[in-house]
Amino acid sequence: MLQSNEYFSGKVKSIGFTSSSTGRASVGVMAEGEYTFGTAEPEEMTVVSGALKVLLPGTVEWKVYAAGEVFNVPGHSEFHLQVAEPTSYLCRYL
């Protein structure tokens, strides 16, 4: 079953799903902007196209992740994103 989600007044949209190869996950697109997300459980984020500038919990420096790159976010935390162009991603819930 697919579950559609919309955040930040429609600037971030995702579709949640479960599959044997990825487990529970969502795939989505972020429009240009700055966003803060909270996590309930650990997440693995893969940038599919575009790039995300990320400030992870416990860090003080922003890091850019380009298409094909992966970063992990601890559970029960929040992370900040800056998006300069429409960017797609895959989020796996670990």
Swiss-Prot record:
GO terms for molecular function: guanosine phosphorylase activity; purine-nucleoside phosphorylase activity; thymidine phosphorylase activity; uridine phosphorylase activity. Keywords: Glycosyltransferase, Transferase. InterPro entries: Ppnp, RmlC-like_jellyroll, RmlC_Cupin_sf. CDD domains: cupin_PpnP-like. The keyword Endoplasmic reticulum does not apply. The keyword Glycosyltransferase applies. One of its GO terms (cellular component) is cytosol. Its EC number is 2.4.2.1, 2.4.2.2. It catalyses: a purine D-ribonucleoside + phosphate = a purine nucleobase + alpha-D-ribose 1-phosphate; adenosine + phosphate = alpha-D-ribose 1-phosphate + adenine; cytidine + phosphate = cytosine + alpha-D-ribose 1-phosphate; guanosine + phosphate = alpha-D-ribose 1-phosphate + guanine. Belongs to the nucleoside phosphorylase PpnP family. HAMAP family: Nucleos_phosphorylase_PpnP. Catalyzes the phosphorolysis of diverse nucleosides, yielding D-ribose 1-phosphate and the respective free bases. Can use uridine, adenosine, guanosine, cytidine, thymidine, inosine and xanthosine as substrates. Also catalyzes the reverse reactions. This is Pyrimidine/purine nucleoside phosphorylase. It comes from Salmonella heidelberg (strain SL476). The gene is ppnP.
